[in-house]
Amino acid sequence: MDIKVTLTQNKKEKPDYSNLPFGVYYTDHMFEWDYTEGIGWHDPRIVPFHNLEMSPCSMVLHYGQTTFEGLKAYLGKDGEIRLFRPELNMERLNISNERLVIPKFNVEDGVEA
């Protein structure tokens, strides 16, 4: 998978890593991946964090359609990032998505993204 990366020009101030409350600090970037009927998932990209724009007809607004991606990443003492069972996480996400009529994605692509 070829993921296009666009880096932000406005980096946020880094928080105190010894005091990180949940849901207060956000990354400088976000992952986006388009879906088109008949084509499937395409154009994966990492872009600067921004507000989302969506149609008033979006299913999520009418039916509360959402799934939670709970992948955990840890920084090792050697400076390497460790992911905890990413393949199983992506498989669970696909199962949840299927229940809400959200199209499945390739698990390997999800892990790479």
Task: Give each language-model segment a name.
Residues 1-113:
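Conserved alpha/beta cores of soluble small-molecule-handling proteins
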